[in-house]
Amino acid sequence: MIKTEEDFKNGQVLLIDKPLNWTSFQVVNKLRWEIRQRFNIKKIKVGHAGTLDPLASGLLIICTGKQTKEIHIYQGQEKEYTGSFTLGATTPSYDLETEIDNAFPTAHITETLLKETTQQFLGNIQQKPPIFSAIKKDGKRLYELARKGETTEINARTVRISEFEITKINLPIIEFRVVCSKGTYIRSLAYDFGLALNSGAHLSALRRTKIGNFCVDKADSIENFIESLHLDSKKSETTP
């Protein structure tokens, strides 16, 4: 179905499969620019309903026009992630953005221990966000302070984990699936999971597969969205 300028202004909900090494902000900017170019308009509202780190891929909900007023609804929905933790080592950012800073034993870790430990994280838990995060404190992003080497106290927050399962074990790497509430940091889950194992861990891969009832397998790549947008342009020019 051909989408018009009015369709985008009245509001569209776009499902985009964010690639690795893109920020969520870059995806929003790219789509906004393409929509503006397609319809030769100066301004249109475009926003996302929940950020993904550059080192994560998967589902982004992008809202346009009047639909941006509903972003908070999508932000509040449960999210599903799959990915991997690397056991036996930690990093300051809790993922691959920074180098390993400490190594820990893993010889005692068994499949039984792994699966028993997941149970500690189900339900409402207290979680501290990573120091390398976009959360603001005293007007500054935490990652700005972290990159300057400044230390700061971070308060724990209540988050909810509905499901947490280990899907594959190939030590030191384990694969997982998590269903969690808004505000949950999977990087922090990796770090805390490592501590609970009397070891260490960091997030080595992450993909968001669901937000509420929206699934990543229904999402477009950025390239496919742009192609269909301009294909609509050609169709509309040839339609009598």
Regions found by a protein language model. Name each.
Residues 1-240:
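Catalytic/RNA-binding core of pseudouridine synthases
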